[in-house]
């Protein structure tokens, strides 16, 4: 059964709701709201790989986000990266 991945901006919204200590890491989350798919280009600049770079940047800077929701969402984001 093939399922369609959730839009990245939807995942970002769930992160915003769950990560209580987001604070200084917000800069790594904000770009995720621009994208639906991992293959999306930057909406303003049009460069390819923008969504992938944003997801990689977020994952690299989200080690302090813990818990079951964090684990599931990080797995989901890694799954998006592996699809491409």
What are the residue ranges of the model-derived segments?
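Short intrinsically disordered terminal tails
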Residues: 1-6, 78-84
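Sequence termini and other peripheral, non-core segments
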Residues: 23-24, 28-31, 84
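Short, compact, well-ordered microdomains
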Residues: 61-83
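Acidic, low-complexity, intrinsically disordered interaction modules
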Residues: 38-64
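N-terminal acidic leader/helix
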Residues: 3-26
């Amino acid at each position: 059964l093939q399922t369609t991945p959730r839009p990245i901006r939807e995942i970002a919204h769930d992160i915003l709701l769950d990560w209580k200590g987001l604070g200084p890491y917000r800069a790594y989350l904000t770009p995720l709201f621009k994208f639906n798919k991992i293959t999306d280009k930057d909406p303003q600049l049009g460069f390819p790989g923008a969504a992938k770079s944003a997801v990689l940047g977020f994952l690299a800077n989200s080690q302090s986000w813990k818990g079951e929701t964090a684990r599931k969402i990080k797995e989901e984001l890694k799954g998006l990266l592996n699809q491409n």
